[in-house]
Amino acid sequence: TLNIYYTTGDDWNLGQFPDRYRGEWEANAGWLRLAFHAYANDPPRPYQDAPVEKLLADLDLINAEIHRFAGPEAFSPAVVVHFGMTRPEAWGPLYDRGSRVLGGYFRKSPQGQWDINYRMDDARSEWLSRHDLLKDFASGMIFSKVDIVVNSTPLDKIVPALEPVVADPRQGEIIDLLTHEQYFWPLYERYLPDHAERMDRAIGFVTGRGHRPVFLQDGFLGGPES
């Protein structure tokens, strides 16, 4: 799933993207889908303290554009909100708009506070830091711990980072891989020449151990509902 913005922050936005490629999006929807991430890359943590109405307005705006230029087959409900931080009051409305799983880091910041956790309480954040998933029954939302950020992990550290996760029955059933695609771009100031190789190493490692790719928003965690 590609998590996308509405605007680059200058003079371009999704409303300018043509629908001439819609057939290609639809033809490839079996492996490639688009989902809301945020209105823009900046500012950081845009929804951490923002009113829920702001998050939902941006979500609806981007969802409408995805349906327009890519079609419903290529659309995914939100999977990762930018910086993985929202008010807890947003979990229910996000569920009502189709999200069933939200991914985050669920780890402590340098200041010792649980972070990138959708403002979840400390007890559940700590539990989720050691497990695959946790369901908030009040909202219905399931939270998934991201197991590796590929662009932040050197090539030779990827397998060592994933090996203990795969070996742990509390964490190894679902492997949540995440990267930031700008590291593929030679024009990006922090371009990583080996980014594609890092992705290949991570995906190859987990598929080599029997895992298969799924869309977590489909059915129940990518599998049938019953």
Q: PLM ranges: what are they?
A:
Residues 2-87, 110-111, 181-185:
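Metal-dependent polysaccharide deacetylase catalytic core of the NodB/CE4 family, i.e.
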Residues 52-60, 155-159, 192-196, 200:
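Non-membrane alpha-helical structural segments and their capping/turn regions in soluble enzymes
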